[in-house]
């Protein structure tokens, strides 16, 4: 039995528009005012180049969700006049309401993300690899929201785990978020310092930014329980395709390695030759022995193109 770990590169290899830049295009078409306001908090303006927007935010969208410039936000917010007759006395509740409305983008992002996933066209998608077949007993963990495995390859949905949600009725809705816990701890420290100095206005601003970080935080520990069924399958081979083996998803690899008794062979397909060593090292850092890792060009995987 084999376990496939599948990332967004798999969908993109099928020529599906599933990058976060494609998500931005959806927002630009249907929610331009929201997009402009959202990007403004990352100091992106409409006239900026596509390359600049991609590098600053969209190329690594989930990681960059936490990269708002909180110092500038705090400085700007401290200068906001709320028009209260009592000055700054009792201003905290008013400020929290004000800035919550300013920074509650993530709830809308989640709604728009689900809408976008529904628009991704799968009808014309055809198989491009012979390695995935519904005749095998293989099981699948996918980081993708789409149903390419189920629809294009006719894989039994019971064999497919959408670790971060999908459009299936019994799954979580699509989930996105950053993994930068340090930003949360840093803003807590600033809030506590403001409490010491009785700076009610700054306390309120820090709390709202902290809420934003917490709301946009994807705590992978909350989804680890979904992997528990691996213990009974005990795959002999684990195949990674279309995933960068990096970022906030790395803890899953350690957990998968542990649940398979650290015995399975790992065949990892890379798209970019220059990332091969980095991907291998990431796996080693998760406790996977280099002797059990085989790196392969993904062109060998897509043998029906």
Identify the meaning behind each predicted range.
Residues 1-14, 23, 224-305:
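SIR2/sirtuin-family catalytic core signature
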Residues 19-59, 212-219, 287-305:
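Extended charged low-complexity segments that act as oligomerization/scaffolding linkers
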């Amino acid at each position: 039995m084999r376990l496939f770990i599948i990332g967004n590169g798999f969908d993109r290899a099928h020529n599906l528009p599933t990058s976060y830049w494609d998500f931005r295009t959806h927002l630009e078409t249907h929610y331009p005012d929201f997009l402009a306001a959202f990007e403004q908090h990352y100091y992106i303006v409409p006239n900026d180049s596509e390359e600049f927007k991609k590098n600053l935010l969209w190329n690594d969208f989930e990681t960059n969700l936490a990269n708002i410039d909180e110092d500038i936000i705090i400085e700007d917010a401290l200068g906001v006049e709320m028009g209260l007759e009592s000055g700054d006395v009792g201003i905290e509740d008013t400020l929290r309401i004000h800035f919550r409305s300013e920074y509650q983008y993530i709830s809308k992002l989640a709604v728009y993300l689900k809408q976008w996933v529904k628009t991704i066209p799968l009808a014309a998608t055809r198989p491009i690899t012979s390695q995935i077949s519904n005749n095998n007993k293989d099981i699948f963990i996918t980081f993708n929201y789409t149903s390419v495995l189920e629809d294009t390859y006719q894989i039994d949905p019971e064999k497919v785990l959408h670790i971060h949600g999908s459009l299936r009725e019994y799954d979580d809705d699509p989930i996105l978020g950053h993994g930068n816990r340090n930003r949360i701890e840093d803003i807590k420290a600033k809030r506590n310092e403001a409490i010491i100095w009785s700076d009610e206005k700054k306390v309120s601003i820090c709390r709202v930014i902290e809420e934003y970080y917490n709301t946009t935080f994807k705590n992978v520990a909350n989804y680890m329980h979904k992997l528990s069924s691996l213990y009974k399958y005990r795959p002999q081979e684990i195949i990674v395709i279309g995933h960068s083996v990096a970022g906030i998803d790395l803890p899953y690899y350690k957990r998968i390695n542990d649940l398979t008794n650290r015995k399975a062979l790992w065949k990892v397909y890379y798209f970019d030759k220059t990332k091969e060593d980095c991907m291998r090292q990431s796996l080693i850092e998760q406790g996977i022995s280099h002797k059990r890792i085989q790196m392969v060009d993904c062109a060998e995987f897509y043998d029906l193109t």
